[in-house]
Amino acid sequence: MAFPTVSYSRDTPAGYPGMIATTEPHHIISMVVSGTSGNIPFGIGVLFDTAEDTVKLPTAIGKFAGVAVVDRTLPFANGEVYKPYDQISVMKNGSIWVTALVAVAQGDPVYMTPTGGFTNVANAAANPLIENAEWASVTSGVNQLARLRLGVTK
């Protein structure tokens, strides 16, 4: 009887935006998408809205709430987004897959763009620094999947 050839990579396989990246400790909170927010794609940074326990899709600089975590229990018709008034899971601390808008390196600082994307490019007028966050993987180009680590103690 022949045995199939099996091999395993030592690297974690790539995930998808909004997927929890590792089993390291993480903290996820439940919020509600503001009625005035646009649809929030998985893996996008969100801002606190003015009403208690609500978040919104960024349209300008605001107070960073966390990263939208994938929820596979949402109706298929929603697509891969949270809609206004949906309950949303927001990662505050831990490791999550996101799309890096530019090439990043491990340990680089993380900045959020006004549309909720993530970069390592500083721009005080448009890309605020996310405190205690760092890139946990390396990319070689634009719009590539990367691990973002929130709540880093240095």
Language-model segments: residues:
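Surface-exposed, low-hydrophobicity beta-strand/loop segments enriched in small/polar/acidic residues
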Residues: 1-154
